[in-house]
Amino acid sequence: MDVDTAFLNSTMDEPIYVKQPPGFVNERNPDYVWELYGGMYGLKQAPLLWNEHINNTLKKIGFCRHEGEHGLYFRSTSDGPIYIAVYVDDLLVAAPSPKIYDRVKQELTKLYSMKDLGKVDKFLGLNIHQSSNGDITLSLQDYIAKAASESEINTFKLTQTPLCNSKPLFETTSPHLKDITPYQSIVGQLLFCANTGRPDISYPVSLLSRFLREPRAIHLESARRVLRYLYTTRSMCLKYRSGSQLALTVYCDASHGAIHDLPHSTGGYVTLLAGAPVTWSSKKLKGVIPVPSTEAEYITASETVMEI
């Protein structure tokens, strides 16, 4: 659901004055100014004011804000929980039945002017599909295709693995890039994919992110390879199966540093729910230099437990 002119629903927290806009100038008092009553697009505090407004509104109708994810709200009913995910002026509503969804929709439309955009098929860059049996799949197929087009990579060259072992990223013979913007742009797109719906590239992207300040030609070539891999496998998705046991399954592991990356270690974890990952990470262990590999394993396990 989309809230119409969302920012205008909030009220200003301090006096803000604007010039009279063309076509609305008071001829008798052309030097007068207007005082803004509601938040307006373009004001630095407008997003915060709207967020506070929608937060208070949802709490008034019985929703609780998730302590860890402030954009997620939930309310318990006898038929099951209702969830509302808020992203600026877009609300994603999940209810246990169409009847309860219609009831929540009526509550919200009494408070805001809103448009029901129908069953969700895309949200925050994710392609979302819900089958007739309740299975939900998430993919980044459209986002990846757009990123590949913008980066002008060779999409006809199929790539089945994200990195090439024969091209070490830590070699110093490769020349520095004169313009680092293309590299930073591609890595930014890869980071979005790695953090959103493609856990399989978490390690390669974490590795490439270490060279954002002074990338070399080998790094740009490797980043393009990861993007080609994403394009080749763009139909891959996360599938959450209806009726699966809602129990977390967690895996974590650590390496004791690659030969070119010693003495640091890389730690990673993945959390599965309903048959697919819900959280994951791969990053260099900072601040400590584990002596035995066992120490790296314990550090990674500790960070995994803290995430859960």
Swiss-Prot record:
Its cellular-component GO annotations read: intracellular membrane-bounded organelle
Q: Which UniProt keywords apply?
A: Transposable element
Q: Tell me which Pfam families the record gives.
A: RVT_2
Identify the SUPFAM superfamilies for this entry. Answer: DNA/RNA polymerases
Q: In its keyword annotation, does this UniProt entry include Iron?
A: no
Stored CDD domains:
RNase_HI_RT_Ty1
Q: Which domain of life is it from?
A: Eukaryota
| Repeat recorded as keyword | no
Name this polypeptide is given? Putative transposon Ty5-1 protein YCL074W
**Source organism:** Saccharomyces cerevisiae (strain ATCC 204508 / S288c)
